[in-house]
């Protein structure tokens, strides 16, 4: 196992740069795809695929921006001694799996990560940042609580979710054996798929419209179909009608789900 951690001492493949940090992480077996896992409490994640054999991680903590009004009364007339403006980057690599996190809980830290093009990603942001990915071929799982998710020119399979942000995905190629999911509570979903894609689609928005470039063959059940029924333990009989649309693209395939509560759904043909 290789571990690279950032503190006030620098070693090997780790550099401190003007309030930021940069680490070059060798993979155990560069001939195999990498698996990148990132979890940020505060900040955004950018991942770019490239023709490289290692993983390069750059972290930068955003400026504090303290105002005079935020100083304690007891500090009047005193000079503030700033703590090092670094994100506390921590990177661990084991058997081509790279786990990345920062020690910054209160101050947002933005990560820019360059990976081999054939990589799988698990990305999670909670606050004060967006997720952006481009030119990556693999399984991508992107989850942003309070920001938008953008995946550009990616291939493979995607699970993309945002609670309070838009989801924009452009796929060059899809894995024909994998299901996919695109969802948001408050935001639009905009997905571009290859024109030859085969999929069973399930689409639902409570407060929006659904638009598609594809000729979606809708199931005969119509816009509202019975999804659950039966007698409950208290003796009452329950019927539930699902408001989602079900259909197929190009004859059907793995299931693709598109779900928004407050937003439009756009399905484009590449």
PLM regions: where:
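Positively charged n-region of N-terminal signal peptides that target proteins for export
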Residues: 1-7
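Hydrophobic h-region of N-terminal signal peptides that target proteins for export
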Residues: 7-16
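Acidic (Asp/Glu) and glycine-rich low-complexity loops/linkers
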Residues: 16-126, 134-135, 141-143, 158-159, ...
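Hydrophobic lipid-interacting interfaces of membrane-associated proteins
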Residues: 62, 129, 138, 147, ...
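Solenoidal tandem-repeat scaffolds enriched in leucines and small polar residues
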Residues: 151-152, 160-163, 169-170
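Long amphipathic alpha-helical scaffold regions
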Residues: 152-153, 178
């Amino acid at each position: 196992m290789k571990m690279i951690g950032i503190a006030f001492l620098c070693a090997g493949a780790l550099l401190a740069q003007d309030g930021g940090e940069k680490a070059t992480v060798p993979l155990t077996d560069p001939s195999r795809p990498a698996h990148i896992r990132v979890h940020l409490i505060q900040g955004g994640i950018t991942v770019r695929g490239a023709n490289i054999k290692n993983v390069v991680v750059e972290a930068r903590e955003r400026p504090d921006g303290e105002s005079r009004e935020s100083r304690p009364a007891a500090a009047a007339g005193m000079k503030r001694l700033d703590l090092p403006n670094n994100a506390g980057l921590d990177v661990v690599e084991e058997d081509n799996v790279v786990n990345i996190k920062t020690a910054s809980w209160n101050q947002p830290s933005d990560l820019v990560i360059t990976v081999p093009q054939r990589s799988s990603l698990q990305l999670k942001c909670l606050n004060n940042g967006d997720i952006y990915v481009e030119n990556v071929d693999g399984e991508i799982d992107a989850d942003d609580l309070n920001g938008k998710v953008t995946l550009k020119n990616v291939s493979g399979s995607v699970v993309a979710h945002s609670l309070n942000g838009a989801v924009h995905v452009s796929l060059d190629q899809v894995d024909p054996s994998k299901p996919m999911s695109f969802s948001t509570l408050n935001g639009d979903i905009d997905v571009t798929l290859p024109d030859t894609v085969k999929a069973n689609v399930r689409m639902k928005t409570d407060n929006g419209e659904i638009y598609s470039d594809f000729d979606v063959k809708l199931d005969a059940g119509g816009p509202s179909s019975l999804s659950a029924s039966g007698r409950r333990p208290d003796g009452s009989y329950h019927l539930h009608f699902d408001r989602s649309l079900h259909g197929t693209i190009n004859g059907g395939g793995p299931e693709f789900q598109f779900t928004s509560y407050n937003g439009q759904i756009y399905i484009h043909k590449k």
